[in-house]
């Protein structure tokens, strides 16, 4: 577990960043990584090795950032699993935005002249809400919850086929830019989205002993069934993949596979 019940001098654990010329400091409340009573330095070294052998560094960061600094909550394994899945969701959204930008790159030249931001309050509020959270005693928990609202809106916009593509592109470009500007200050979303997604998928494929050769074969058979309009067989194959821990998402852009467990309440990773 991560315990924050030890009083560590603030000069050892405060974190500072500068935003628009103002300095903000985060005090994790004596947060150390420790399974048993130990000194701050020993705990940090010991537990960092244990946690980072299981989880990406940004998962650890998100777990701490999501923990109220004034609270007495102790972070346990289930918190890391939840943060890993939330971070996966964030990176999936960022990757979907990048894919949409690539698919509509021909519209880029029109953005400056004809592009319109669909929800200015959401897009322009990203930086404003972040600064407000920092002014609220460096409330990183609030900042993360605001990120979640923006990502939910981004996914809704991506899935809205009735919205003007140029305005969607203009809006999503600005969301991507603003989110990275503030999130990078907290040390998250530093990876290339596609790289992070592949790393987490590979981890869960190994954890669940998923035979990807068999999965690929089933997906090809399903595609053939769909092409032949044999939808009953297509649904049967989809159900079989689900039993193997693979979910299939069909959209206007085709079919995409993902790891079922990443969208469920997870088990402990031992």
Residue ranges and their predicted role:
Residues 30, 37-270:
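Structural preference for alpha-helix termini/caps and helix-kink/transition segments
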Residues 1-43, 248:
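Active-site and channel-lining beta-strand-loop segments
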């Amino acid at each position: 577990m991560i315990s924050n019940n030890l009083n560590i001098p603030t000069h050892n654990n405060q974190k500072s960043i500068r935003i628009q010329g103002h300095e903000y400091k985060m005090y994790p409340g004596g947060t150390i990584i420790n399974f048993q009573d130990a000194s701050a330095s020993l705990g940090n070294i010991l537990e960092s090795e244990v946690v980072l052998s299981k989880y990406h560094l940004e998962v650890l960061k998100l777990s701490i950032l999501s923990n109220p600094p004034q609270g007495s909550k102790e972070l346990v394994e289930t918190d890391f699993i939840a943060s890993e899945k939330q971070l996966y969701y964030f990176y999936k959204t960022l990757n979907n935005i990048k894919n949409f930008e690539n698919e509509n790159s021909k519209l880029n030249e029109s953005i400056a002249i004809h592009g319109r931001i669909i929800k200015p309050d959401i897009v322009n509020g990203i930086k404003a809400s972040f600064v407000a959270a920092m002014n609220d005693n460096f409330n990183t928990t609030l900042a993360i919850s605001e990120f979640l609202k923006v990502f939910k809106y981004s996914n809704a916009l991506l899935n809205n086929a009735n919205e003007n593509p140029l305005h969607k592109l203009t809006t999503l470009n600005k969301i991507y830019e603003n989110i990275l500007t503030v999130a990078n200050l907290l040390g998250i979303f530093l990876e290339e989205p596609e790289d992070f997604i592949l790393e987490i998928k590979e981890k869960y494929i190994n954890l669940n002993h998923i035979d990807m050769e068999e999965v690929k074969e089933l997906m090809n058979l399903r595609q053939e069934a769909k092409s032949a309009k044999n939808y009953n067989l297509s649904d049967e194959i989809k159900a079989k993949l689900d039993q193997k821990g693979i979910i299939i998402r069909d959209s206007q852009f085709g079919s995409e596979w993902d790891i079922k467990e990443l969208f469920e309440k997870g088990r402990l990773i031992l």
